[in-house]
Amino acid sequence: MLVAGLVGLVGVGVPAVAFLAEYGCGEREERLGAVLARESVLGAAPEGARQRERYRGCDDDDRRVVAGAAYRYGGSAAQALRHYGGAAPAAGWRGTDVPGCFVKEVDGTTAHLAVEGPKDGELLVEILADREASALC
């Protein structure tokens, strides 16, 4: 009985150890985040927008990387979308069927640029990517 229990534990434990070794953000995600953060479109704000913060990070669960900028902006969503409809393609981004969503190959994966808002006077411009090339907007 003890031997069977140990065999069962070892059988379950090996995949769990492999999973834990693969869990979380690492050097590849850090490098991708640095590349995304340098994308010029993050600094291409509409007229009248004031940058509040720049940020980047990685979600350990799915290793999704984000780099973004938050702006104080008094304009409308239509004005913001119109602005990025010109600024994003000028920086190499392609439009999609989703308003405010653009795609571009960055560091060997497909990155998604999302323009959100303004909501409560805040405009978010984010680039999201993962090594699985997931559809992110």
What are the functions of these language-model segments?
Residues 1-137:
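An acidic-aromatic pocket/loop used at catalytic or ligand-binding sites
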